[in-house]
């Protein structure tokens, strides 16, 4: 929004030309989101407390979680709002990638909001039925995938980047739609499953979001793309503004969400942020690298799938003490902060490995 104004002003005042630089707009986007969340979170927490919008804790979970009951939730609304405001202010609103990512993020957050709302109103931890939630996610994910496929202007936008292999970029054709759909929907649910401890999902989301911003920056530049043997995607650079806003908003919220959490982001935050990472990975053509960097999300999801499947096949036996995986380690006696920080460390290592794929080919 401000880019249109500064483009006009820069014709008369040279100082405004700095707003044309992607790096500058990305930095101020992150700072805007960070300041918004840091300054408004205390008021939001008080407001949620006054409304008695408290977390409902399941009785069959770890007993240490019972003390979390009543902690304000749905704070993820502020994360999403801060991201949207920052991107609308500092992004190029004529860029189609920006709008796709924003709309997917907001739509999945809306699903999360409905889920949180039902949990609070009905005073249970069930929320939306799994079928209803998945149906809504599928519609949005499929629409986004179809749009990205048919709006592609170059073959590079639908090519699959295979890590560590140089000049191997198979065009997916219509299979692109299937892959994009599963990445968006799967990512949303994976982050949601991981968001079971204070800050556990948020810090990995921030780290991966920053890394995807690096990929977006390199993909936008023809010279960088050619040198690194990755697809050149015109317009993908604006995604950096979104990633920066995500990082800023995430860090700001983490200030209040870190152990012991003063507020939870709820499904409105985790579903939206998960979808944001997924659709961003699709846009910058780094689905497989995202699978690597989001190893914690993958492990958490697989632990649930394996646990449920084995439980049904074995007649009640379990692989893990409890799923998702972070609960397994809690029941083994690991303190919650230890589980959180170790998962963060693993994600940091995986993100470095993901960034290394830019050069190791």
Curated annotation (Swiss-Prot):
Any Gene Ontology biological process: cell division
Pathway where this protein functions: Cell wall biogenesis; peptidoglycan biosynthesis
The record describes its membrane topology as: Multi-pass membrane protein
Q: Which organism is it from?
A: Coxiella burnetii (strain RSA 331 / Henzerling II)
Keyword Cell membrane in annotation: yes
Which PANTHER family does this chain map to? PHOSPHO-N-ACETYLMURAMOYL-PENTAPEPTIDE-TRANSFERASE, PHOSPHO-N-ACETYLMURAMOYL-PENTAPEPTIDE-TRANSFERASE HOMOLOG
Which parts pass through the membrane?
18-38, 73-93, 97-117, 135-155, 168-188, 196-216, 235-255, 263-283, 288-308, 338-358
Q: Which UniProt keywords apply?
A: Cell cycle, Cell division, Cell inner membrane, Cell membrane, Cell shape, Cell wall biogenesis/degradation, Magnesium, Membrane, Metal-binding, Peptidoglycan synthesis, Transferase, Transmembrane, Transmembrane helix
Localization, per the record, is: Cell inner membrane
Protein name, UniProt field: Phospho-N-acetylmuramoyl-pentapeptide-transferase
Chain's role = Catalyzes the initial step of the lipid cycle reactions in the biosynthesis of the cell wall peptidoglycan: transfers peptidoglycan precursor phospho-MurNAc-pentapeptide from UDP-MurNAc-pentapeptide onto the lipid carrier undecaprenyl phosphate, yielding undecaprenyl-pyrophosphoryl-MurNAc-pentapeptide, known as lipid I.
Q: Which family does it belong to?
A: Belongs to the glycosyltransferase 4 family. MraY subfamily.
Disulfides per UniProt:
none
Query: Needs which cofactor?
Result: Mg(2+)
Q: Which GO terms describe its molecular function?
A: metal ion binding; phospho-N-acetylmuramoyl-pentapeptide-transferase activity; UDP-N-acetylmuramoyl-L-alanyl-D-glutamyl-meso-2,6-diaminopimelyl-D-alanyl-D-alanine:undecaprenyl-phosphate transferase activity
